[in-house]
Amino acid sequence: MNPEYRNKKIENKIRGLISEGLQKIKVPEIDALKSYIVISRVLVSKDKRFADVFVSYIGDADSRKRAVELLEKYKGFFRKYIAQNLRIYTTPELRFKEDIGIEESIRINKLLDEISKNNKNISDK
């Protein structure tokens, strides 16, 4: 099997298992935030020792930062959950990171809308 294809399969499986584990974890701190947390993508290193988990949060930047800190705090739970449900030689160490890609794309779309409105106003005059 192509190693790149295998890594993609592992990344998708880990992403799904973290999302699943997020729903199963019973921690009051996370319970309040988990309906707003989105695991947007996972990147596994070539040696499969590390997995960078990118987290988006539907809300403000401070809440997103808090969500990433909480996930980092409970990463042992998620790693154990992955180890129990994924047949792989070693379970990668999880590193949770903020994913600002969604917010950036929204910001860019707003800027493009403003530009098109300005161009329309100029052409109307």
From Swiss-Prot:
GO cellular component: cytosol
Keyword line: Cytoplasm, Ribosome biogenesis
InterPro entries xrefs: KH_dom-like_a/b (IPR015946), RbfA (IPR000238), RbfA_dom_sf (IPR023799), Ribosome-bd_factorA_CS (IPR020053)
Annotated localization: Cytoplasm
Record GO biological process: maturation of SSU-rRNA
MF terms (GO), sorted A to Z: ribosomal small subunit binding
Keyword Cytoplasm assigned: yes
Function recorded in the entry: One of several proteins that assist in the late maturation steps of the functional core of the 30S ribosomal subunit. Associates with free 30S ribosomal subunits (but not with 30S subunits that are part of 70S ribosomes or polysomes). Required for efficient processing of 16S rRNA. May interact with the 5'-terminal helix region of 16S rRNA.
Subunit structure: Monomer. Binds 30S ribosomal subunits, but not 50S ribosomal subunits or 70S ribosomes.
Family (UniProt): Belongs to the RbfA family.
Record PANTHER family: RIBOSOME-BINDING FACTOR A, CHLOROPLASTIC-RELATED
Protein name: Ribosome-binding factor A
Protein's organism: Thermosipho melanesiensis (strain DSM 12029 / CIP 104789 / BI429)
